[in-house]
Amino acid sequence: MRLSNADLERLKSMANTLRFLCADMIDKANSGHPGVCLGLADVMVVLSLHLNINPTNPKWLNRDRLVFSGGHASALAYSLLHLWGFDLSLDDLKRFRQLHSKTPGHPELHHTEGIEITTGPLGQGFANAVGFSMASQYAQTLLDKEAVSHKVYCLCGDGDLQEGISYESASLAGHLRLDNLIVIYDSNQISIEGAINISFSEQVKTRFLAQNWEVLECDGHDYQAIHDVLEEAKKSPKPTLLIAHTIIGKGAIGLEGSEKTHGSPLNKEVLKQSKENAQINPDESFIISPKNKMHFEEVKVRGVSLEALWEKSLSPKTKKNPCVKEF
């Protein structure tokens, strides 16, 4: 599907809303990781067009699973959950990284609605996503393929793929041909210590091809390209690694591509200039236009409809199966 010019403008506006909502959270907390949030914003607004979840019922059995393997991107996760319509308020975002808040420094299962798994140690979330995919295939044997047909999306970065746990679990995923697993690799070539080539020169694409994965690549700031590879990934008969070539700190004036955005808030002047450049009022914080809020909440509207259709499609036998509720 070709995105129209209106679609592209809408996605750009949504991405900037997401970027600076994250930046404001981190600025208020005076702690966090803005680089990944700014760099992945374009990918995430396009993923919003593909993700099948229902924020009014976070435990819907056939929802897509979304794993943030890089748990340090928590501001991005929380901003999206709020914008998509989960039970996470703007005030919750303003309490980011505060004691007893619903928005801790790293995402925690059973603590924040919409978070699928606790993540933090790099590589762990990748393995969790493989486990989710395996679980869905097992669930199909207990129910049926129509009842369990969701995708598992995992967001990972350079650091995740340097860890042994991601290598081992990727090998298993390829061996089992986990075709509902889509890993989006935020390839920005930067870590907290600087350029990734200081410590890592492996050919990641070649590694995953050898492990029996589909490997796709795109410019992580080109909305049409992101959309196209996501469409292709959903049809793959194997697990897919989607390499999104991104710029860490995208939109941060003077700091794009710099490791300085990895684990420190943007300074006040950079944040002000960056907002101005994105045509956002620099004197205001936590701003979400009604139009953009409506666009993000299309995820919820779609999810409610999809769950209703799913319920109707279940066979009488499947509806009586206790596993429907247990999963």
Feature map (PLM): residue ranges:
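Glycine-rich ThDP/TPP pyrophosphate-binding loop and its adjacent helix/strand module
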Residues: 54-55, 111-298
